């Protein structure tokens, strides 16, 4: 932990330092995957198939209105997407950032519960 004699600077720098040092959930997922050989023995195609499996399980949970399984399914998909991105030579953070930049200023409207972008 960062410590400075000036309490104001200590709060700001301590928070900033902690944010830099603390591993993100994505970092923890990558460490978990590395330790299990997913990046050495896996590939994009197998991770894509795993994503399809998790997608189906999440769909079933949604249809059954099973909130614990919905949470589990979404989390599982994020884990798989993190690994898929890594195996594709990018990062989940880069993918999320690129997607947000694309949609940030998008205009559209809600139709039948889905946002439809203007053409």
What positions do the PLM features span?
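Flexible "arm" and connector segments at domain edges
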Residues: 2-74, 78-119
């Amino acid at each position: 932990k960062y410590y400075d004699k000036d309490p104001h600077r200590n709060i700001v720098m301590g928070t900033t330092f902690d944010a830099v040092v603390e591993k993100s959930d994505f970092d923890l997922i990558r460490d978990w995957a590395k330790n299990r050989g997913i990046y050495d023995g896996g590939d994009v195609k197998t991770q894509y198939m795993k994503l399809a499996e998790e997608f189906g399980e999440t769909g079933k949970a949604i249809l059954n209105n099973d909130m614990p399984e919905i949470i589990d399914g979404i989390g599982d998909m994020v884990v798989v997407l993190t690994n898929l991105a890594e195996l594709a030579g990018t990062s989940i953070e880069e993918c999320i950032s690129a997607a947000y930049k694309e949609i940030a200023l998008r205009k559209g409207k809600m139709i039948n519960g889905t946002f439809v972008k203007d053409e």
